[in-house]
From Swiss-Prot:
Belongs to the SecE/SEC61-gamma family. It is a single-pass membrane protein. Component of the Sec protein translocase complex. Heterotrimer consisting of SecY (alpha), SecG (beta) and SecE (gamma) subunits. The heterotrimers can form oligomers, although 1 heterotrimer is thought to be able to translocate proteins. Interacts with the ribosome. May interact with SecDF, and other proteins may be involved. The keyword RNA-binding does not apply. It is found in: Cell membrane. The gene is secE. SUPFAM superfamilies: Preprotein translocase SecE subunit. This is Protein translocase subunit SecE. The chain crosses the membrane at residues 37-57. GO terms for cellular component: plasma membrane. It comes from the Archaea. Pfam families: SecE. One of its GO terms (molecular function) is protein transmembrane transporter activity. Essential subunit of the Sec protein translocation channel SecYEG. Clamps together the 2 halves of SecY. May contact the channel plug during translocation.
């Protein structure tokens, strides 16, 4: 019984979250995409710099 109750509780909470959430506007979606892209580029550049430094120091 406890397993069934936990599943029903999860479904109930999921419905509530879906009811409250909304679809992002085009502008919001583009802003999130830009920020995510910039973050990926920054992480890539940092990794590239670290690999260059490691090659220079390690030989």
């Amino acid at each position: 019984m406890k397993y069934r109750e936990s599943i029903l509780n999860f479904i109930k909470q999921s419905k509530r979250v879906l009811r409250v959430s909304k679809k992002p506007s085009r502008e919001e979606y583009l802003n999130v995409s830009k920020v995510t892209g910039i973050g990926i580029i920054i992480i890539g550049v940092i990794g590239f710099i670290i690999s260059i430094i490691a090659q220079l120091l390690g030989g």
